[in-house]
Amino acid sequence: MPIVYYILPQVWAWKPWRAKSIEQNCDYLCGILPFELEMYKNALAQKRALYVGHPLLDEITEFKSEALPYKTAPIAFMPGSRKSEIKRIFPIFAEAAKSLPNRKILILPEHFKKLDSQALNEIYGDEIKAFDISFEANKALLESGFAFICSGTATLQATLIGTPLVLGYKTRGIEVLIARAFVKLKHIGLANILYNALYSNAPHSKMRDGTQQIHTELIQSQLTAENLLKAFEEIDIESFSTKAQELRDYLKHGSAKQVAGILNEILDKQ
């Protein structure tokens, strides 16, 4: 039975030598990031490496063709999914929120649904009382005019919906040193990584120059309530919306149908 690898490891970010082993041990490589297939040149030449679309576009069907009035519309807050990062980042987000009169939506990870109010208070602190709670990220982002987001895939999620954002991230110093030693990317937000790749045509060299970005990133000491509010006030809504549409066009479509088609074709040959 052929081996199909769907959602490839991030060899473009670190440990690129893994690509050769993956090529040798898998029959088909299904990438969800357009640029990452360049890491698998042999499989690409043999048409065994395919871009199948991004799974977020299977669930995100709506895009704001016109941005909401972000200074009066609700504002979404996504301070992460791990308790440790929430405890580092949410207090800073909450401090910035105090200066904003907008309705505030705190988006909680789905695995927190089983937690009672006391458990949530232990994680988020008393500041949680100033927020409306939502477990439906896509819905909350769609109705929000702006978002304060921790990092990672959530930045792409907001961008594909068309919600302007600022990324804020803070972690332990030792983790930063390790990341800088092994990961050479300029950005940490997936939306920025993808947008930079779109204009550099390389997954592991030019894309690291960081010359293109969709949203501001505030990392470590840069992450303050003052800087978050500054990013909020200075957002260029029109520019963001244009870039968000470009990124959506770059990713093209969801991946479910394409992967299912590949699997059906393989099974038909067995």
Show the residue positions of the predicted features.
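Nucleotide-activated sugar donor-binding and catalytic core shared by glycosyltransferases
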Residues: 1-270
